[in-house]
From Swiss-Prot:
GO terms for biological process: blood circulation; brain development; cerebellum vasculature development; DNA damage response; mitochondrial respiratory chain complex assembly; ovarian follicle development; ovulation; protein localization. CDD domains: S26_SPase_I. It is a single-pass membrane protein. One of its GO terms (molecular function) is peptidase activity. It comes from Mus musculus (Mouse). Catalyzes the removal of transit peptides required for the targeting of proteins from the mitochondrial matrix, across the inner membrane, into the inter-membrane space. Known to process the nuclear encoded protein DIABLO. Its EC number is 3.4.21.-. Heterodimer of 2 subunits, IMMPL1 and IMMPL2. Gene3D superfamilies: Umud Fragment, subunit A. The keyword Transcription does not apply. This is Mitochondrial inner membrane protease subunit 2. PANTHER family: MITOCHONDRIAL INNER MEMBRANE PROTEASE SUBUNIT 2. It is found in: Mitochondrion inner membrane. GO terms for cellular component: mitochondrial inner membrane; mitochondrial inner membrane peptidase complex; mitochondrion.
Length: 175
């Protein structure tokens, strides 16, 4: 009887040690390095959710890649919605600070992206709530860079940072 209590106590201690090490490591990893997210809606079709409401892609979000707020034109990023801070949205970076972009339905036909901001759009222009609705987005709202589609298995692929040719900035802020 004493041996079984001793064995149970050792198992419990081992579990607790593992638990109290694994949980902080997992939380730190998910907060600072990477996590997964389900993409809802049609705003990023055909890149994400090409099947519409019948399926939802699950993507890998890399936090580490945007830790210094460094993004490139064409990157698909997750960001805090400028209109609803409780919500995260996934969009494509179209323009960076200093770029001049031709808008689609924005109050100004041309917009120069201010310092510390980016212009983001969904790939499905008629069905996207993006910078054409709310203007340039602060880099401070950047959450992660979407790097891979993980689900469904038949769509597993790396997400390329490709800027649609018709959405290239008219003038870039690069020197």
């Amino acid at each position: 009887m004493a041996q079984s209590q001793s064995w149970a106590r050792r198992c419990f201690k081992a579990f607790c040690k593992g638990f109290f090490v694994a949980v902080p490591v997992a939380v730190t990893f998910l907060d600072r390095v990477a996590c997964v997210a389900r993409v809802e809606g049609s705003s990023m079709q055909p890149s994400l959710n090409p099947g519409g409401s019948q399926s939802s892609d699950v993507v890998l979000l890399n936090h580490w890649k945007v830790r210094n707020f460094e993004v490139q034109r064409g990157d698909i990023v997750s960001l805090v919605s400028p209109k609803n801070p409780e919500q995260k949205i996934i969009k494509r970076v179209i323009a960076l600070e200093g770029d001049i972009v031709r808008t689609i339905g924005h109050k100004n036909r041309l917009v120069k992206v201010p310092r510390g901001h980016m212009w983001v759009e969904g790939d499905h222009h008629g069905h996207s709530f993006d910078s054409n609705s709310f203007g340039p987005v602060s880099l401070g709202l950047l959450h992660a860079h979407a790097t891979h589609i993980l689900w469904p298995p038949e769509r597993w692929q790396r997400l390329e940072s490709v800027l649609p040719p018709e959405r290239c900035p008219l003038q870039t802020g690069e020197k």
